Curated annotation (Swiss-Prot):
GO cellular component terms, semicolon-separated: cytoplasm
Broad class of where this protein is predominantly found: cytoplasm
Record field: catalytic activity: cytidine(1402) in 16S rRNA + S-adenosyl-L-methionine = N(4)-methylcytidine(1402) in 16S rRNA + S-adenosyl-L-homocysteine + H(+)
Annotated signal peptide: none
Localization per Swiss-Prot or TrEMBL: Cytoplasm
Name the record gives this protein: Ribosomal RNA small subunit methyltransferase H
Entry's family note: Belongs to the methyltransferase superfamily. RsmH family.
Comp. bias regions, Basic and acidic residues: 315-324
GO BP annotation list: rRNA base methylation
Species of provenance: Maridesulfovibrio salexigens (strain ATCC 14822 / DSM 2638 / NCIMB 8403 / VKM B-1763)
Source lineage: Bacteria, Pseudomonadati, Thermodesulfobacteriota, Desulfovibrionia, Desulfovibrionales
InterPro entries cross-referenced by the UniProt entry: RsmH (IPR002903), SAM-dep_MeTrfase_MraW_recog (IPR023397), SAM-dependent_MTases_sf (IPR029063)
Amino acid sequence: MESKKLIPEEVHTSVLLNEVIEWLAPKPGGRYLDGTLGMAGHSSAILKIAGEGAELAGLDRDEQALELAGERLAPFGDRAHRFHLAFSKFEAALDELGWDTVDGVVLDLGVSSLHLDHAERGFSFIKDGPLDMRMDPAGGMPPASSIVNKGSYSDLNRILKLYGEEPLASKITKAIIAAREEEKITTTLQLASIVEKAYPAKRRALSRTHPATKTFQGLRIAVNSELEELKTFLDRIPERLSPGARVAIISFHSLEDRIVKKTFKAQSQSCDCPPMQPICTCGKVKLMNVLTRKPVLPTEEEMKVNTRSRSAKLRVAERTGEDG
């Protein structure tokens, strides 16, 4: 699908915004779900394009993000509904609104600039702040500092290797454990320095990213149970989609993208019983049609304007009819 500039530049801060709007094709009277409300870039565009009668439920784990999103969504009045919820809890929001189904869904799985730009949230390895990384500090989950200072070698190594996709996971884990024996690791720059020193100088020189990038990714995913959240959402969302409703998901690393791709593919398949079997016993029903065989990538122009978009991948699937 060829990208068109549908949204004015002043709100074009969300990644792949025009592409999301094209694929979702918001319509008057539609009901939409933004599971990662953030600064409401996608949400405000959906409501603006959809026009009269359209409503949107926006979810976010971050209360600060919800407050800021409220300012951006204010012009839409009671057409915009905000909920302090993780996107895996979307059913609670729809039930509260009395919506059986929605006509379109968007998830932007990237880390918000709100988190990266505010050192006190503990997501940045460039600015010093407490080693926190919780999307919802009031949500009851332990901060990253707890994992770093109390986690076993096995747990830390698994987090960095599996979630961070860090090839030097073992070396970095050993460096973290050695450092914490000397003093507690409490700040982001303290951890970033430990990781940087664990990297061979030649590897640091050749890398285009900071040595701590993958370590911070792994810890953030673990702290916020991000992959489990995504799997839960993908498994449950088809039940709350109207026929023809589309789900647009933007991922930023291969772990997320693989989950989205694999789930969409599984949901697009029907009976997988042996061909010679006369009666279906598996009970599988085709739920979705995959619309993007390959992920939609940002344009060169967008990558120049918004460097955050460089690793973004958009995949879209559409709910089948009532009978699957």
